[in-house]
Amino acid sequence: MHHIKIMLSRLWQCADRTRDRLLFPGCDFAAWVTQEAAGFTPEQGNQYQPSTNALPQVLRRFPITSGDRILDVGCGKGKAMALMRRFPFGQVAGFDISPAMADVANRNFRQLKLRDCHAFQADAATFTGYDDYNYLYFYNSLPKPVFREAIGHLEESLARRPRCCRLIYLNPVYHDFLVRDTAFREIFRRRSWSSWFTYVCYEYRPG
């Protein structure tokens, strides 16, 4: 069964790369990048893989307005952010531990002429600038210790500036930690044939 999943995953990757070339001409979203090639260690982050094209179907479940701001934690080349920009977020931002990956993302945004869409370099283990955001996006970009640190910083922000916050998580390998050890609660999920491509959405409400 595991070998079948790997084969199906490779077929999906090939199909998704083809779709990305059609959807985002002139952009570099599709190719996977290892930690070594991106300039960081496996202890700092996971390899880059582009988010799936199903993200807009997930975002349509939310009443997004210009008052909402979303942050992609571990944005890589920025594909998820380009998809987010189809919605009326007041701001779409993202960061990656690799400055080279953030540079690729910003080149992609310029190619697509996307406004209010910017990637910057930061380490999720130490980043604390969550106060301005009420939507967060993760695509299993972080090892568990770093993910715990990031969620801890997010919870500090929510205590400091109480607000409703939604977290969108693709390939939610640390789902149990979120629902057991944090104040976030699952509100819905979009299932796929593999957990690798399953989205789970969570919500935090103050009080």
Language-model features, listed with the residues they occupy:
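Conserved SAM-binding loop
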Residues: 105
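C-terminal substrate-binding/active-site "lid" region of AdoMet-derived donor-dependent transferases
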Residues: 145-201
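Glycine-rich SAM-binding Motif I of class I
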Residues: 78-82
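Conserved SAM-binding strand-loop segment of SAM-dependent methyltransferases
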Residues: 114-124
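Conserved S-adenosyl-L-methionine
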Residues: 86-91
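S-adenosyl-L-methionine
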Residues: 1-65
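Conserved SAM/SAH-binding beta-strand->alpha-helix loop
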Residues: 98
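Conserved class I S-adenosyl-L-methionine
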Residues: 68-74
